[in-house]
């Protein structure tokens, strides 16, 4: 599984996707990018951003407190200029950039940040807004001054800082958080501070974003702080794999998400770039339900593991962009341990169980 990457060619355009293809090799000034998406988005409440189509939109229209550098994996400033935490990671204080606004003109200040994380950390039953899966042990927020906000946790929460950089922590306006969960399936109801804003939507079919001309607050260590190079992005839901790749090769689209392994060569042969950035989370896997009587016995599952030639499957059906997993976690994920010696193809060992 692949997710969370930035395309330098688009500067202030952020995308998420698995095996995506982009037509340009240098920054493009002006124009509208035609983006063919495999599936329609479902809900744009930021904690729902883990679903690719949702995240691919949220990354354009929202900013985050921090930015995780995809090369170094370091957490760097974005809306938060700096931050501190206590020794046991139960308190975090963030100092915000001046002059940041949501697209409706309201300030992205400490009060707005506090409301966002109170909602993501505690949920909002009245509006049916669920708790974010990346925020644990959240207790409360405190607005210290208009540009300083402090968060408190019931237990040590060392992962919170990284959590502020994820898609699920995109910052939205106070008016957005006053809507019910069901209303946030309509992209026009999402007010963020990102480099693009929603112009129009044909639910389930098409979404149009336009660049925000007054945008001046990209991640602090990114060279381009101003507006996006593009004038806009048009997402068109195109479920059929053959139609997406055909449109790209015919020059009818500039970017497509979800490229099948067998289509990669014809794309690269025509000079297209394939972006398959590895996940920093959990690998794709085939999991069994232990309450299924056929595989309830651990020994049965172990036998199936060692009787399966995973390398042959990967090399036969996929491409180099689908490396064989060596753990449940991706090699770039925090806490990764190489478990290759426990995942071997060994028919003799399989028969021992």
PLM regions and their residue ranges:
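Surface-exposed binding/hinge segments that line
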Residues: 95, 131-178, 195-202
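Short, well-ordered beta-strand elements
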Residues: 29-39, 81, 91-93, 113-117, ...
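N-terminal lobe/hinge region of extracytoplasmic solute-binding protein
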Residues: 36-87, 118, 191
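Gly/Pro-rich hinge or "lid" segments in bacterial periplasmic/extracellular proteins
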Residues: 69-70, 74, 165-234, 240-243, ...
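Extracellular/periplasmic solute-recognition and catalytic clefts
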Residues: 122-123, 141, 199-210, 236-292, ...
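Append "and occasionally in soluble cytosolic enzymes with long acidic Gly/Pro-rich linkers
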Residues: 77, 211-216, 296-353
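Bacterial N-terminal signal peptides that target proteins for export
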Residues: 1-10
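Aromatic- and charge-enriched surface segment that lines or borders ligand/interaction sites
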Residues: 81-126, 144, 150-152, 294-296
């Amino acid at each position: 599984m692949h997710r969370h990457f930035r395309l330098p060619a688009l500067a202030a355009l952020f995308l998420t996707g698995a095996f995506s293809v982009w037509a340009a090799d240098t920054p493009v000034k002006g124009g509208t990018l035609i983006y063919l998406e495999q599936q329609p988005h479902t809900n744009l409440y930021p904690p729902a951003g883990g679903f690719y189509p949702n995240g691919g939109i949220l990354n354009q229209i929202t900013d985050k407190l921090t930015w995780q550098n995809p090369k170094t994996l370091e957490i760097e400033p974005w809306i938060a200029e700096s931050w501190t935490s206590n020794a046991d990671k139960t308190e975090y204080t963030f100092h915000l950039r001046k002059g940041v606004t949501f697209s409706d003109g309201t300030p992205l200040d400490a009060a707005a940040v506090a409301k966002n994380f109170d909602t993501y950390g505690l949920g909002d039953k009245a509006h049916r807004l669920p708790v974010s899966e990346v925020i644990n042990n959240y207790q409360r927020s405190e607005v210290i001054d208009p540009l300083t906000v402090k968060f408190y946790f019931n237990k040590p929460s060392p992962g919170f800082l990284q959590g502020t950089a994820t898609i699920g922590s995109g910052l939205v306006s106070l008016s957005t958080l006053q809507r019910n969960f069901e209303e946030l399936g309509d992209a026009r109801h999402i007010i963020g501070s990102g480099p693009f804003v929603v112009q129009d939507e044909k639910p389930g079919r098409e979404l149009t974003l336009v660049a925000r001309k007054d945008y001046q607050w990209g991640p602090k260590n990114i060279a381009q702080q101003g507006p996006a190079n593009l004038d806009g992005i048009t997402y068109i839901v195109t479920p059929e794999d053959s139609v997406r790749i055909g449109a790209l090769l015919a020059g009818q689209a500039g970017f497509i998400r979800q490229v099948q392994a067998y289509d990669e060569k014809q794309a690269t042969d025509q000079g297209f770039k394939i972006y398959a950035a590895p996940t920093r989370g959990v690998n794709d896997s085939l999991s069994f339900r232990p309450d299924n009587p056929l595989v309830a016995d651990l020994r049965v599952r172990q036998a199936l593991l060692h009787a399966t030639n995973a390398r042959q499957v990967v090399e036969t059906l996929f491409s180099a962009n689908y490396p064989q997993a060596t753990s449940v976690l991706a090699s770039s994920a925090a806490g990764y341990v190489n478990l290759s010696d426990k995942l071997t193809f060994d028919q003799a060992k399989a028969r021992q169980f």
